[in-house]
């Protein structure tokens, strides 16, 4: 059991002094010279919260000779000798930069010449690997669990999680001081709000980091449990169903009957557990008995309640059978229906009819949410009829076409793997005629006249994907080729990150 407790330390061997690079300002400037944010991208920060300001603040702090004092009041807290609000904002911003550097070193071995991926993290996969996984593996699984990651979490729990990785007493006193200033220390985060909305947008970097730290902690424990459960078929374990650490290795040999031993091993063998997290939720897909799946459900609940002190009820996890349940995932509507196929087999004078159950993954484009998104962005009305985009009417023809083509190409790349293309073609139709109406509005012409002009100049060919061009070039292809081109094509660009999943 001691070796498992050591494993649950989660490789917390980087005992860094977090305040050292912050106070020795030249070091933090050198560390962040070529550093890009690892946890957040494209955040509009105020120019007042730059690395240069952090350096100047550190210099000013060295020049101060008086102590830092608090004056407790029922309405406000005043900071004697300092502009506390300004200083705390600056130091929190500097702290966010420092911890991103230190924790990104756990994923990347950083140097001033470049970055090299650590061997233990070379199996990081892109979002594009999810769809082939669904097509190849999901049909062999039978249960799916929707897990809503519980929050709010107490700030003290976050600080304690951080202490496992970074041991610096002075830092934790300082960070508690900042947290106490921004909130009542004995209160939780407000419900139904994201973790960084409790604080100002200026501190989004630091609290995104703390939220990711919380998720990383619980997922690391879950990964440990999942890996050990998959190895139970190779070693003898004693099972404890009522505890989070639900098994320990038997140090002394125990005489058990072969029947009981084989039953225990069969109970955990061939688990087929797959876990995906996105947008504050996660999906756990399994192939197991309902009894073991319910046990995993209670393991999650006990983990959150006992390890993180978060109340998680039974409603945070829903378990459904994949064959009887459809679900939304990453902008798709997924279902696995059971298709019955009848095969006639004849042997000499006797013939047999054999029914074969075949599972097939259906990936359907969610037309209603997409229509709402297009109507919200003024590409169509609430009925789905294309309308012009008057905001873009002042742009050049090239810019208008480029914007519409980029949006249409993104839709084509992302939804080309849908099983039923009717909804997919409706979206392309809306975008195409919205572009034509916008150009006709700009040139004060009718849609019919401008459509002929665009067709003659072949400016709309970019609206066709490779699959559509195949159908135009080979209109009389064989039945086999038609079935091939009508099939599912995952046209995904690993160099491009699609943003549609954030709005669906």
From Swiss-Prot:
GO-annotated biological processes: mRNA processing; RNA splicing; tRNA processing
Keywords: Chloroplast, mRNA processing, Plastid, RNA-binding, tRNA processing
Subcellular localization: Plastid, Chloroplast
The keyword Chloroplast appears for this protein: yes
The organism's place on the tree of life at top rank: Eukaryota
A single MF term (Gene Ontology): RNA binding
Keyword tRNA processing among UniProt keywords: yes
InterPro entries to which the protein is assigned, alphabetical: Domain_X, Maturase_MatK, Maturase_MatK_N
GO cellular component: chloroplast
Pfam family of the protein (one): MatK_N
Function: Usually encoded in the trnK tRNA gene intron. Probably assists in splicing its own and other chloroplast group II introns.
Recorded family membership: Belongs to the intron maturase 2 family. MatK subfamily.
Protein name per Swiss-Prot or TrEMBL: Maturase K
């Amino acid at each position: 059991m001691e070796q498992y407790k050591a494993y649950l330390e989660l490789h917390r061997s980087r005992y860094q002094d977090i305040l050292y690079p912050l106070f020795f300002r030249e070091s933090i400037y050198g560390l962040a010279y070529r550093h890009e944010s690892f946890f957040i991208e494209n955040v509009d920060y105020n120019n007042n919260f730059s690395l240069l300001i952090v350096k100047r603040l550190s210099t000013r702090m060295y020049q101060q000779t008086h102590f830092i004092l608090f004056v407790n009041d029922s309405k406000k807290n005043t900071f004697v000798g300092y502009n506390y609000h300004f200083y705390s904002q600056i130091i929190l911003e500097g702290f966010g930069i420092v911890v991103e550097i230190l924790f990104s070193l756990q994923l990347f071995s950083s140097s001033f010449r470049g970055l090299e991926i650590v061997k233990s993290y070379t199996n990081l996969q892109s979002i594009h690997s999810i769809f082939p996984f669904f097509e190849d593996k999901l049909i062999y699984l039978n249960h799916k669990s929707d897990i809503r990651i519980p929050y709010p979490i107490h700030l003290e729990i976050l600080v304690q999680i951080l202490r496992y990785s970074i041991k610096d007493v002075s830092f934790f006193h300082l960070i508690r001081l900042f947290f106490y200033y921004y909130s009542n220390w004995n209160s939780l985060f407000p419900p139904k709000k994201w973790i960084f909305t409790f604080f100002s947008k200026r501190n989004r970097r630091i609290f995104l980091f703390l939220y990711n730290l919380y998720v990383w902690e619980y997922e690391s424990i879950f990964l440990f449990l999942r890996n050990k459960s998959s190895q139970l078929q190779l070693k003898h374990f004693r099972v404890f169903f009522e505890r989070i650490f639900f098994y320990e290795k038997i140090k002394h040999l125990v005489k058990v009957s072969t029947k009981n031993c084989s039953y225990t091993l069969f109970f955990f063998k061939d688990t087929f557990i797959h876990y995906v997290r996105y947008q504050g939720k996660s999906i756990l897909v399994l192939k197991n008995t309902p009894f073991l799946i319910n046990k995993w459900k209670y393991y999650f609940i006990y983990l959150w309640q006992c390890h993180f002190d978060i109340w998680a009820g039974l409603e945070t996890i829903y378990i459904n059978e994949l064959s009887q349940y459809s679900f939304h995932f990453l902008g798709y509507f997924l279902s696995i229906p059971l298709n019955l196929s009848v095969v006639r087999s004849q042997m000499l004078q006797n013939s047999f009819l054999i029914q074969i159950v075949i599972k097939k993954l259906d990936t359907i484009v969610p037309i209603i949410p997409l229509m709402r998104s297009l109507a919200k962005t003024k590409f169509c009305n609430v009925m789905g009829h294309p309308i012009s985009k008057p905001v873009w009417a002042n742009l050049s023809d090239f810019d208008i076409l480029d914007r519409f083509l980029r949006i249409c190409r993104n839709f084509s790349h992302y939804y080309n793997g849908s099983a039923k293309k009717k909804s997919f073609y409706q979206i392309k139709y809306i975008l195409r005629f919205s572009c034509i109406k916008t150009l006709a509005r700009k040139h004060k012409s009718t849609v019919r006249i401008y459509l002929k002009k665009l067709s003659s100049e072949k400016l709309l060919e970019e609206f066709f994907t490779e699959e559509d061009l195949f159908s135009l070039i080979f209109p009389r292809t064989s039945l086999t080729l038609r079935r091939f081109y009508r099939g599912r094509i995952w046209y995904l660009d690993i160099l491009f990150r699609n943003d549609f999943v954030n709005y669906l």
